[in-house]
């Protein structure tokens, strides 16, 4: 994670965003309720076990329509702050909640790349 160049929103500069047609963006799951950007948000699903109760983590991508830097955020909705699963896994590679988050974030990244909105991300690299 060290020495990764990031954009002004903290996203690895190797990752690029491409805005597709309005119809395609909506089909993929983006909204543009805020007229100046496309927004994608998906909740991370945890097992229905007591030890995971209370986790409310989301994966978010915000792409400004003016071409300025986009953001990719994993947020802890309970504490209204970033959930830095990558840093936590760097310190404890077996921390189960972060492994769950990582797997689903990577699935959403692959989905967005497969659909042509994002490019340049390789599995496991810093986002």
PLM regions: where:
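Intrinsically disordered, low-complexity regulatory regions enriched in serine/threonine/proline
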Residues: 9-10, 65-127
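Ser/Thr-rich, low-complexity intrinsically disordered terminal regions
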Residues: 18-20, 26-65, 85
């Amino acid at each position: 994670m060290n020495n990764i160049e990031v954009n002004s929103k903290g996203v690895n500069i190797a990752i690029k965003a491409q805005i597709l047609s309005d119809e395609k963006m909506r089909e993929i799951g983006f909204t543009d309720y805020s007229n100046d950007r496309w927004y994608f948000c998906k909740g991370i699903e945890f097992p229905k076990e007591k030890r995971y109760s209370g986790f409310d983590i989301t994966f978010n991508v915000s792409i400004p329509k003016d071409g300025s830097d986009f953001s990719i955020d994993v947020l802890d909705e309970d504490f209204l702050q970033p959930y830095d699963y990558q840093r936590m896994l760097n310190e404890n590679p077996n921390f189960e909640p972060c492994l769950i988050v990582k797997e689903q974030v990577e699935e959403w990244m692959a989905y967005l790349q497969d659909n042509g909105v994002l490019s340049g991300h390789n599995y496991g690299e810093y986002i």
